[in-house]
Amino acid sequence: MKLHELQPAAGSRKVRNRVGRGTSSGNGKTAGRGQKGQKARSGGGVRLGFEGGQTPLFRRLPKRGFLNVNRKEYAIVNLDQLNAFEDGAEVTPVVLVESGIVKAEKSGVKILGNGELTKKLTVKAAKFSKSAEEAITAKGGSVEVI
């Protein structure tokens, strides 16, 4: 193989199809838009959800539910994730964010009981599940709601 024999992989390069450049090109005259009509014009086409004047589906269906502006969303941490800390360490939301276990604090951190805790820790968080609280205290650690 020589330098002048190098070629791109088959199908990796596709020539852009220039439309409206003469009838013999195969895409001249109407440029693949069919005959006349709204969709053939420049800027033509109907808006999203338009059904030709018929009441669109999104207006035929009833409204449902609401968005609670006071909704609290907690960052969730499971017990097995807390094993990343040293024995006897104090775990706070700030420490969890710094260590990368939690991306953002949100409305606070909630500790759930999935997995097994092997370290004695002092955990400070906004909420704890019952099983998580029991597991932390069973290992000799302490729980503090902040």
Curated annotation (Swiss-Prot):
Naming one, the record's GO cellular component terms include: cytosolic large ribosomal subunit
The record's annotation in InterPro entries points to: Ribosomal_uL15, Ribosomal_uL15/eL18, Ribosomal_uL15/eL18_sf, Ribosomal_uL15_bac-type, Ribosomal_uL15_CS
GO biological process: any one? translation
The yes or no answer to whether the keyword Plastid is present is: no
Gene Ontology molecular-function annotations? rRNA binding; structural constituent of ribosome
Disordered: annotated segments: 1-51
Alphabetical keyword list: Ribonucleoprotein, Ribosomal protein, RNA-binding, rRNA-binding
Record field: compositional bias (Gly residues)? 23-35, 42-51
Q: Note the Pfam families from the entry.
A: Ribosomal_L27A
Asked whether the keyword Ribonucleoprotein is assigned, the reply is: yes
Q: What is this protein's function?
A: Binds to the 23S rRNA.
Family, per the entry? Answer: Belongs to the universal ribosomal protein uL15 family.
What do we know about how this protein assembles, alone or with others? Part of the 50S ribosomal subunit.
> Which HAMAP family does this UniProt record tie to the protein?
Ribosomal_uL15
Protein name stated in the entry: Large ribosomal subunit protein uL15
